[in-house]
Amino acid sequence: MTSANCGSGDHADQLVPQLVDRLAIRELVDAYAYCADRRDAAGQMALFTEDTDFLVYMDSRDPSPTQHLRGRGALAPVFDELNTYIATMHFNGQSTAVLDGDHASGVTYCLAHHVKVDGSERSLMIAAIRYLDTFVKRNGTWFFSQRKLMVDWTETRPLVTG
């Protein structure tokens, strides 16, 4: 059987770079969550382009963002805000990525758990988040060029340890 009969491998030659890019984008998304939970604001900021846009929608139904930050340096206060919690855990769920050369767009679902202490009371705030992302690959590395943090709902409840 010749290679013409089995396929020339062209499909695989096209598929492998796409798989590599998709994996790199997923690792970027997961690195953002990891840095958030480890309180590594500098590491989190390094995942963004210098000219990034970061928009926060505390109510995803509202067309106007609650916050709009421009530039990597502007992100520090938002990421430092996580220090008001004694612990966080971001669980990334399903995600999509649409590749277009060195650009991509995608959506990632996340359940973000935030533990807070107020005196002797502990509370857990869970936020259902959708990230609407635009990515760019520079010098072989993927970055966020825009990230929209869309809060679909939150729940806050006492946290009881047993």
What are these regions (language model features)?
Residues M1-E50:
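Short, low-complexity N-terminal intrinsically disordered segments enriched in polar/charged residues
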Residues L15, L19, P65-L69, R122:
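Charge-dense, low-complexity intrinsically disordered segments
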Residues V16-L19, D51, F79-L82, V117-S120:
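Short secondary-structure boundary micro-motifs
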Residues A41-L111:
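A solvent-exposed, acidic/Ser-Thr-rich amphipathic alpha-helical stretch
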Residues A31, A74-P77, R130:
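Alpha-helical elements of Rossmann-like donor-binding domains used by nucleotide-donor carbohydrate transfer enzymes
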Residues H11, R22-L23, F54, A76, ...:
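Generic signal for short, ordered secondary-structure residues
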Residues T2-D13, T84-G162:
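A beta-strand edge to alpha-helix "cap/lid" segment located at domain peripheries
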Residues D21, I25, D37, H68, ...:
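Aromatic-acidic/polar surface patches that form glycan- and anion
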